[in-house]
Regions:
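PP2C/PPM-type serine/threonine phosphatase catalytic domain
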Residues: 1-246
């Protein structure tokens, strides 16, 4: 398994509120977290880094090696982190603090994920890009209800409003999903700074190119910057080879 994690401030922002990292537990199983923070001053930076590092430290301490154990772990620890960030967000200096979260566990040839907010997870298989997550956003809710079109959604003035985040008062309702990976598959995890700037077709074209995994990640970020780079851009690209899925 090859993995590249890349984050970039983009063209317009002065600080980077995205955070991503990979952790291995005592059973040697990998979990990748990506978070896109929000909140004034430095609250967004703190929320994203805290969610990833807290959950990463909790994962490292486990000996989890089965899908069912991952499910139970997600159910307990995502809500714990939600409450912790919500508590800190009550301080004046951390007001409005919260973060999206993508958590991706790799158990042999099974990829189990949890999704909160409008960062995304995608699968590139046989030359096609498939979005595996559905944005927890106001615009996506309007789109699903048939109140706006895809075209209107892309330029909607409230497209940055998310309906779920780590740090909210209410109990989290994450989406969970699982995919059995095949040799040659790529998993793409990204903040909205990528997918607000480039299309799924562009992501697919870069991912299926002959570049190395690291160069593919760099190219994705470069394309997003060339398209305007309106937000921080974070990409995690994972490639599964024959020996990873045998």
């Amino acid at each position: 398994m090859e993995i590249s994690i890349l984050t970039d401030v983009g063209q317009r922002r002065t600080n980077n509120q995205d955070y991503a990292n990979q952790y291995k537990n005592k059973a040697g199983k990998s979990m990748i977290f990506l978070a896109d923070g929000m909140g004034g001053h430095r609250a967004g930076n703190i929320a994203s880094e805290m969610a990833v590092t807290d959950l990463g430290a909790a994962w490292v301490a486990t000996e989890i090696s089965t899908i069912n154990e991952v499910r139970e772990w997600f159910a307990e620890y995502l809500e714990k982190e939600n409450q912790q960030i919500h508590r800190i967000g009550q301080d004046e200096e951390h007001k409005g603090m919260g973060t999206t979260l993508e958590a991706v566990a790799i158990i042999d040839d099974q990829v189990l994920f949890a999704h909160v907010g409008d960062s995304r997870i995608g699968l590139v298989r046989n030359g096609e890009y498939h979005q595996l997550t559905s944005d927890h956003s106001l615009v996506n809710a309007l789109l699903k209800a048939g109140q706006i079109t895809e075209e209107e959604a892309a330029h909607h003035p409230q497209r940055n409003i998310i309906t779920q985040s780590i740090g909210q008062k209410d109990e989290l309702q994450p989406d969970f999903g699982m995919v059995t990976v095949e040799a040659g598959d790529f998993i793409v995890i990204n903040s909205d700074g990528l997918t607000n700037m480039i299309s799924g077709d562009e992501i697919r074209d870069i991912v299926v190119s002959d570049l190395s995994v690291e160069e593919k990640a760099k190219t994705l970020v470069r394309f997003a910057n060339n398209a305007g780079g309106l937000d921080n851009i974070t990409v995690v690209l994972i490639h599964f080879a024959e020996e990873d899925v045998a």
